[in-house]
């Protein structure tokens, strides 16, 4: 308990899956959180659950990460409510399966806008507020797809690759300017989330097929444990890193 006590965190795509697990873990470890998502019903439900366990620890804002004006409003509301921001988890994502030949331009642009542009906008507008709060930690959710050649996840891989590269540039920028802000990317493998279940259906395979891989199927809580480490002062010298959480899937 208390590994991130006193910190304020903003988590995008937090209504389900990895983001939901991150929010639960951050509140459990003492943070106050703003959770955002386009799914207002699920987001409000999660905020209510978190507040039942720890009053005043969470609130929800409906937020499309593709919209810069919404980013400005969300960051301003976090600062107004909690006085600052110490942890940003850029988690929002979307998958539209397709190969380099079958992917449409609209599908490609959608995934770039949610993940690549969404991460850019989040970092751009969070950095000044985090700097003024004395520093903090930016955690960008990438994927092992940014390292591996998955033809059926073509546009998704491209977007997550952009997140991987941006993370390094942001880390160096903040270090050179002495902002005391760290920026790292997390690269999950196959995790038991709604997104992976949907992918399995589209591939025509049962979710158990992922479980039977040598690396197995991870749980959202596995990623949340890593997020807590990166959000806490335990990782104070970890900056610009790529943290794989895939049970060696990417190195096989």
List where the protein language model places each region.
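Residue(s) in the substrate-gating loop at a strand-loop-helix junction
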Residues: 143
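Short, small/polar-rich loop/turn modules that mediate ligand/substrate recognition or access, typified
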Residues: 177-182, 238-240
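A conserved structural motif in NAD(P)-dependent oxidoreductases
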Residues: 212-223
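Active-site helix of classical SDR
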Residues: 123, 159, 167
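Short C-terminal tail/terminal secondary-structure segment
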Residues: 3, 148, 228, 239-252
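Alpha-helical segment proximal to the catalytic Tyr-Lys
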Residues: 128, 172-176, 236
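Substrate-binding pocket helix/loop in short-chain dehydrogenase/reductase
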Residues: 99-100, 104-109, 138, 196
């Amino acid at each position: 308990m208390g590994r991130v006590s006193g910190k304020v965190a903003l988590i995008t795509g937090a209504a389900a899956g990895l983001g939901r697990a991150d929010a639960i873990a951050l509140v459990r470890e003492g943070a106050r959180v703003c959770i955002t998502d386009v799914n207002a019903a699920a987001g409000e439900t999660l905020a209510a659950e978190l507040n039942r366990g720890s009053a005043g620890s969470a609130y929800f804002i409906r937020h499309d990460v593709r919209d810069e004006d919404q980013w400005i409003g969300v960051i301003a509301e976090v600062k107004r409510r909690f006085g600052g921001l110490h942890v940003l988890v850029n988690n929002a994502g979307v998958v539209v399966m397709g190969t380099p030949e079958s992917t449409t331009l609209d599908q490609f642009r959608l995934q770039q806008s949610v993940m690549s542009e969404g991460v850019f906008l989040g970092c751009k507008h969070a950095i000044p507020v985090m700097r003024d709060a004395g520093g903090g930690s930016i955690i960008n959710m990438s994927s092992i797809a940014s390292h591996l050649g998955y033809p059926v996840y073509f546009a998704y891989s491209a977007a997550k690759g952009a997140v991987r590269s941006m993370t390094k540039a942001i880390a160096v920028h903040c270090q050179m300017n002495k902002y005391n802000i760290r920026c790292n990317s997390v690269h999950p493998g196959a995790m038991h989330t709604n997104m992976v279940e949907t992918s399995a259906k589209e591939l025509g395979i049962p979710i158990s097929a992922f479980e039977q891989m040598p690396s197995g199927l991870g749980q959202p809580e596995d990623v949340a444990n890593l997020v807590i480490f990166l959000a806490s002062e335990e990782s104070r010298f970890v900056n610009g890193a790529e943290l794989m959480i895939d049970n060696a899937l990417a190195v096989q």
